[in-house]
Regions:
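Positively charged n-region of N-terminal signal peptides that target proteins for export
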Residues: 1-5
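Cystatin/cathelin-like cysteine-protease inhibitor module
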Residues: 103-109
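Short, non-transmembrane alpha-helical segments in secretory-pathway proteins
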Residues: 24-66, 130-173
């Protein structure tokens, strides 16, 4: 339940800037599943073929620009959402994708930590990071820099953008306690106006979630 509430919150935040430019038109569950699996396999370098699909609805308004917003004046409408989850055979969700039913747009995608496998080198890096005391803050700054670079490299490859702008979404924040692994979020802006919120994990350097804040 908590996971679903978190996902719905992320989608509501996305709606405030997300434009419903007509892409594929109204889609059904089968098409939502196809879109989600393609997205997961591309963005997370996975090879999934099976998923379950669940429908939900959220109330929205349109502002003066035509953007979807979750509060406003005038008549509201219900927008259908598809939640596609991989795999369907287990209660542990490895990947989850939220798709707008009216256009086929991906709003949000995430992966579970169970899908992450650290290399031996990354495990040693995590242990060294955890036990270090005197230079821990410097090590954390260095880790953050490497994580930002990983996000930049990912955006170049997956978002088809040669010069993405990567902004720190949690600028100045540091974990309150030492951790072997930690996550951090970045805003990624492309030259054609797309905006994403991308969550990364250190030391795997893997993307954990992608929120589409503004589409093409």
């Amino acid at each position: 339940m908590k996971r679903k509430l978190f996902l719905l919150t992320a989608i509501i935040l996305s709606f405030s800037l997300f434009l419903t430019a007509c892409k594929q038109g109204e889609i059904d569950e089968a098409k939502a599943k196809e879109i989600a699996l393609n997205y997961v396999n591309n963005m997370f370098d996975a090879n999934e073929t099976q998923a379950s699909v669940e429908q939900d609805q959220t109330e929205y308004y349109r502002d003066e620009t035509g953007a979807l917003v979750t509060s406003g004046d005038g008549n509201s409408s219900l927008e259908r959402l598809y939640f596609v989850r991989v795999p369907e055979e287990t209660s542990i969700i490895q990947y989850e994708v939220a798709i707008l039913g009216s256009t086929g747009e991906v709003l949000y995608a995430s992966r579970g930590t169970s899908s992450i496998r650290l290399t031996d080198a990354q495990k040693k890096q995590a242990e060294a990071f955890y036990v270090e005391t005197s230079e821990w803050e410097d090590l954390h700054v260095s880790a953050m820099q490497s994580l930002r670079q990983a996000c930049f490299d990912w955006a170049k490859t997956k978002l088809d953008e040669s010069r993405p702008v990567v902004l720190d979404a949690n600028r100045g924040e540091m974990p309150g306690v030492k951790q072997r692994q930690f996550g951090h979020s970045f805003y990624v802006v492309t030259r054609d106006g797309r905006v994403y919120s991308v969550s990364m994990q250190w030391p795997s350097m893997q993307v954990m979630s992608i929120e589409v804040i503004h589409a093409k």
